Curated annotation (Swiss-Prot):
Residues 188-269 form the Expansin-like CBD domain. This is Expansin-B10. Belongs to the expansin family. Expansin B subfamily. GO terms for biological process: plant-type cell wall loosening; sexual reproduction. Its main location: secreted. InterPro entries: Expan_Lol_pI, Expansin/allergen_DPBB_dom, Expansin_CBD, Expansin_CBD_sf, LolPI, RlpA-like_DPBB, RlpA-like_sf. It comes from Zea mays (Maize). It is a peripheral membrane protein.
Amino acid sequence: MAVNVRTMWSSMRAQVAMVVALVFLVRGAWCGPPKVPPGKNITATYGKDWLDAKATWYGKPTGAGPDDNGGGCGYKDVNKPPFNSMGACGNIPIFKDGLGCGSCFEIKCDKPVECSGKPVVVHITDMNYEPIAAYHFDLAGTAFGAMAKKGEEEKLRKAGIIDMQFRRVKCKYDSKVTFHLEKGCGPNYLALLVKYVDGDGDIVAVDVKEKGSDTYEPLKHSWGAIWRKDSDKPLKGPLTVRLTTEGGTKSVYDDVIPANWKANTAYTAK
């Protein structure tokens, strides 16, 4: 049987072209939008200058973000005071593997037209790793809507992703510093969730001093706003806690953890 070489060659070229096209389609699906490297870490410095960022939102439109009102910092009830659903997931240079938890920022937007241009304060309560901008705030629905003109909140949320500006500010929590002993704590294991710290808001070191001791022992950063200590011997309460904020401020809370402390219990500074 005669073979038409030209026809075969044309067919092969068509098949090769199809394969190449599929490769590019698959690569495009894998690669997605261009990734933007994170910016420099936002430190405990306070000025008048604003930085550019992207803003998105998640959860319920008028909610606190996570369905369980928690988040990557380990806080509970971020829908209640003093957070009041004004939480934000910071990207890498803002969340800082949990060391940015509790820090506070003023945010605002000028566009689209629904933006008020007036700053509102949000708290870092969660994390995001979406590489869409050097700085990215994934906001609770309530916090995103707070940047809008009155009555335009829902229209602004429909924008989905917008340009915004931000700057770090001192925290002014309307609550006392609270230490929550996490579930699983026992005589030889201490895990503290620290929250509502005025000023810098975020913590870089936690130390505890046992009853009758003059020496502070450091806790290790576990995750989010949680710090832990594994001890070879049972810890003797009451425990005094010393906090160091990112800006270097040290605060001491004498005997804040009682001798008969219990897991899954919050103790408030006097």
